[in-house]
Design a protein with these regions (language model features):
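Conserved pre-motif I regulatory segment
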Residues: 2-35
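Walker B catalytic acidic pair
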Residues: 151-152
Length: 486
């Protein structure tokens, strides 16, 4: 490809060196992959690339597609933070069941606009006919002067899914295409095929998945009754595959980025199931009754109600008589996505014993028991020191430290981790500060990414906002402030 000079413009936020390197590599490419580990700022690189192409007169439309837990970040955080103020733009967020105001905003995409339009959709909607129809209409209407990007592109790794097929087809109508992910391979090198097909059909040199698989996977015929099938038992020619990917990608790990800030905070949004919504509303109304008629509410009463709401977000509820109801939660799926997207060791904090047990089981099932350790009240003293030693050993296979911040949040050194996930936060500010500092100690120059799982429209938002902004919740949840939260 002809290398066109990168247009210099006034960055709204100064890029780190690795971000500038990524922009230099990708700015003029028709298709490109940003393989940048979580916390290295790949969203900013894409935004700067969009602005560059707009400044050069190449595009006036961008379609950004991301998982439900991420696509809201683009609208509320990434675009406002990084898009230059001197560039005229509008952001339209797709909502599956919009209210009247949201519906007007979505329909406004048909209106003439002098600047650049950024349309943000969640990737899950492309599993539906409605989502595919909207995406196809946008592609036909704006694709010739547009760019399409999939954030966390491992969401389209399944070659057989309707979502993947729809997006691979849709991308053909766009002049520019991008994929963004921390790691294009979550389980198997076979994962990269459909992601690269989204960028450009046949870019790896194969007209179909089976030809690609035959080149890079070792296959054996298995018999099951009267039927037989071909099973992947290993991989081959991976150096060749990596060289092909290098032609249209930029890769960076957090450990290689020396100028990142010490602490990077990222929200990950999790929608509630129907059962969670029902129970949450029921308990919320019960809590509000406590405030009626000017009744004096004690701190323990208020904390109990808050805890019950938090339990619902984690997928269970303990009644006054001790009965525990368990139900589906998408929180564990969001955690799994993070674990697959991120390399290296991870700390996962939750205040609830139920969460710790469930997380440990799910991660063991997905990654192996030897990769997982629990550190909470049930953990014996001799096991505790062994867990710390294994986790701190960079050559150890222990990858996931799952703990209660009240038990493990003080005094321990867990500096091998570069990623921390808060599955269910404690209300106590000091507990949060102490737990953050387990993997980030004085004199250390590495960057740590802190990810809070947040269910939109719930007390999660209030809790995380307060803790990240160093507000002591233990004082604020008493009285009228708590009523506002509910």
């Amino acid at each position: 490809m002809e290398n066109k000079q990168l247009v210099k413009y006034n960055f709204k936020t100064k890029p780190f060196k690795h971000q500038m390197d990524a922009l230099d590599a990708s700015h003029d490419k028709k298709y490109f992959a940003l393989f940048m580990e979580m916390g290295t700022g790949k969203s900013k690189v894409l935004i700067d690339n969009i602005v560059h192409l707009y400044d050069r007169g190449e595009i006036n439309f961008a379609l950004i597609i991301a998982p439900k837990g991420v696509y809201r970040n683009w609208v509320e955080r990434e675009i406002p933070q990084h898009f230059p103020d001197d560039v005229q733009y509008r952001v339209i967020r797709w909502v599956s069941n919009p209210n009247k105001e949201q519906e007007r905003e979505i329909k406004s995409v048909k209106d003439t606009f002098e600047g650049i339009t950024i349309f943000v959709m969640n990737v899950e909607i492309f599993s539906t006919v409605k989502g595919r129809n909207v995406g196809n209409w946008l592609a036909k209407r704006f694709g010739s002067r547009g760019i399409v990007a999939v954030d966390e592109s491992t969401t389209i790794k399944n070659t057989k899914s309707n979502r993947t097929k729809a997006l691979v087809q849709l991308s053909k109508d766009f002049e520019y295409s991008r994929i963004l992910t921390g790691s294009p391979v979550t389980n198997s090198p076979m994962d990269v095929y459909s992601q690269t097909e989204f960028l450009k059909k046949g870019v790896l040199g194969y007209s179909n998945f089976y030809a690609f698989q035959a080149r890079y996977a070792n296959l054996q015929t298995r018999n099951m009754g009267s039927t037989s099938f071909r099973q992947v038992v290993g991989f081959k020619n991976l150096d060749e595959l990596n060289k092909k990917l290098d032609n249209f990608s930029f890769r960076v790990l957090k450990k290689d980025c020396l100028d990142l800030p010490n602490k990077v905070y990222m929200p990950r949004y999790v929608s509630l199931t129907k059962r969670q919504l029902e129970l949450y509303e029921q308990i919320r109304k019960e809590a509000l009754v406590l405030f009626e008629d000017g009744r004096l509410v004690s701190a323990p009463q208020m904390v109990t109600q808050m805890l019950r709401l938090q339990q619902i977000l984690s997928g269970y509820l303990t009644t006054d008589d001790g009965y525990q109801e368990n139900f589906e939660t998408r929180r564990i799926d969001a955690l799994l996505d993070i674990c697959y997207e991120t390399s290296g060791k991870i700390i996962i904090w939750s205040r609830f014993r139920y969460d710790i047990m469930k997380i440990a089981q799910v991660l063991s099932d997905n990654f192996g028991e030897n990769k997982v350790a629990k550190y909470f009240g049930d953990t014996k003293d001799d096991e505790r020191s062994e867990i710390i030693n294994r986790f701190q050993n960079p050559n150890s296979d222990l990858r996931f430290f799952i703990g209660n911040p009240s038990t493990a949040g003080r005094g321990l050194t867990l500096t091998e981790a570069r990623t921390v996930v808060y599955y269910a936060n404690d209300f106590n500010l000091d507990t949060r500060i102490q737990s953050e500092d387990r993997c980030h100690r004085i004199g250390q120059n590495k960057s740590v990414t802190y990810i809070d799982l947040i269910s939109e429209g719930t007390i999660d938002e209030k809790i995380v906002h307060s803790l990240v902004n160093k507000i002591d919740l233990s004082a604020k949840v008493l009285g009228e402030e708590a009523k506002e939260w509910l």
